[in-house]
Regions:
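Secretory targeting signals
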Residues: 2, 24, 30-31
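Intrinsic-disorder-associated, low-complexity terminal segments enriched in Asp/Asn/His/Tyr and depleted
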Residues: 4-7, 16-19
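N-terminal secretory signal peptides and thylakoid transit peptides that target proteins
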Residues: 30-41
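Activation targets extended, charge/polar-rich intrinsically disordered C-terminal tails
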Residues: 51-71, 195-464
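Intrinsically disordered, low-complexity N-terminal segments that are enriched in acidic
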Residues: 55-180
Length: 464
């Protein structure tokens, strides 16, 4: 169902409850609104097709400023049974045709624990059978991708990490036309686009012509992303129960188009890939949703840009306030996630991943280009992305676990000191919530310590 209510309240039948933007999120003040509006107006100029000049280059994430390739090691899959990865992919350009994507790039959501439903007549998800401990497991997970050429669905599901990201191409192996055609055939055989019709595009012979679509806009966008793009992912472990509302939201989204009368019409402003990915995560209370297809003025405040959403999630899962339970109560999505799933988004295992475009590459330009939406004077999003991708706490699993172990220990130590000094006080109006919160912190600390012990006991292996 669309999250398209013009009110601060958006209903999703898939999540089966109302999402309310908190007062802080809904009204951050006139100054913030003006800054966001200014940034939006700047984006109009850039997205409108201007050349890659000095101004435009200021909005790019540059490979010289960041770690080119970082990925969680093999231990990660054994420690975390379920996670979501929100990925921003850079702009692509074909060497053969000269065609390329828009400056904002692309967004994709990878879900460990959700698998493609091969029995469905159009793209749908189901729970994976069992818990995967290896990326090679066929029941590991699925990549969900929105494409502007889709007509009767909003997204498709590509099964398996290897097909979603490297396209089954080994590091250092040359991407040739033959390897491209092999992946094309694999996509057809796996039924990734079963039941999907497309908006007509130049050169297409029909609205179901799959090979034309794959060659023009499928491979490098919906699957085999590294054939054509560099990819940045924010990986966030989730509770098992959180998979259900995410899957339900996405299935409902496709069902509305596949079984309803309306066609899906992609919009950079009002209904793009990032809107779907963000709102799928909002269905599980990871953060607040964004409205789609509201009035034009309202939509300015609901823009979604792949790189921005990557940074937003990265900031939430690495730097959110978990020290004060009262702050958690003031934030609607965090409060709901805590009470419903016994889960907070700032947590151990929250890591950033960077994957470069394949090189050597006969088919696509390997020049890096990824746009962020921001003020040209402050450049906050670009700088924040560079900082996070350069911080060992958020790219290295062992460092990450030790960081959160210290953080949890400090919270508990401070609580012990406060409890001793307030021993004569019988409690506060938040007494029950406080108890739940500190029980949660104890459990998280014990989980981190268990993970560190398990890593020590694991045989040494190379990175995946």
């Amino acid at each position: 169902m669309f999250l398209n209510s013009p009110d601060p309240v958006c209903r999703s039948t898939s999540a089966d409850h109302l999402y309310r933007r908190s007062a802080v999120q809904a009204g951050n003040g006139t100054a913030l609104r003006r800054r966001r509006l200014f940034a939006a107006l700047v984006s109009v100029t850039l997205l409108g097709g201007c050349a890659e000049d000095a101004l435009t280059s200021r909005f790019q994430l540059k490979p010289d400023d960041i770690i080119i390739e970082r990925r969680p090691d093999t231990a990660y899959e054994k420690l975390f049974p379920y996670y979501v990865e929100l990925c921003a992919a850079s702009r692509f350009r074909s060497k053969l045709t000269g065609e390329g994507g828009g400056p904002a790039g692309h967004a994709i959501l990878y879900i460990k624990g959700a698998c493609k439903d091969d029995e469905a007549q159009f793209p749908q998800l189901r729970r994976c059978r069992g818990v995967a401990t290896s990326l090679e497991d066929p029941e590991h997970g699925t990549g969900v991708s929105v494409n502007q050429l889709f007509k009767n669905v909003n997204w498709v599901a590509t099964p398996g990490y290897e097909l979603v990201f490297p396209g089954n191409l080994a590091p250092g192996e040359r991407l040739t036309l033959a390897r491209f055609q092999a992946v094309e055939q694999q996509a057809i055989a796996k039924g990734i686009y079963r039941g999907v019709t497309f908006h007509r595009f130049a050169g297409a012979t029909s609205d179901t012509e799959l090979r034309d679509f794959l060659e023009r806009a499928g491979i490098g966008t919906d699957l085999a992303l590294q054939f054509a793009r560099s990819v940045f992912c924010a990986r966030l472990p989730v509770a098992e129960a959180m998979l259900e509302p995410i899957i339900a939201f996405l299935n409902d989204k496709n069902r509305e188009y596949a079984e309803g009368e309306a066609d899906y019409n992609w919009s950079a402003w009002a209904d793009n890939c990032s809107h779907t990915m963000r709102n799928a995560l909002a269905a599980a209370n990871i953060w607040s949703p964004l409205s789609v297809r509201t009035t034009k003025i309202r939509q300015i405040f609901n823009l979604a840009v792949p790189a921005n959403e990557f940074v937003n999630l990265a900031e939430l899962m690495t730097g959110g306030d978990i020290e004060d339970y009262r702050d958690i109560l003031r934030n609607g999505p965090r409060r709901d996630a805590f009470h419903e799933f016994d889960w907070l988004p700032t947590r151990q295992g929250a890591l950033l991943k960077t994957l470069p475009v394949h090189d050597p590459n006969d088919l696509y330009d390997t020049t890096f280009w990824l746009f962020t939406l921001q003020s040209p004077f402050l450049m906050g999003k670009t700088q924040r992305a560079i900082e996070l991708l350069s911080d060992e706490r958020f790219v290295d699993l062992d460092t990450n676990l030790h960081y959160f172990e210290r953080r949890y220990a400090a919270i508990l130590a401070q609580h012990d000191e406060r409890r001793d000094s307030m021993a004569s006080v019988r409690g506060t109006r938040f007494r029950r919530v406080e108890g739940l919160y500190y029980d949660y912190i104890h459990i998280q600390r014990a989980e981190v310590q268990s993970m560190l012990n398990r890593i020590v006991a694991m045989p040494t292996t190379s990175e995946e």
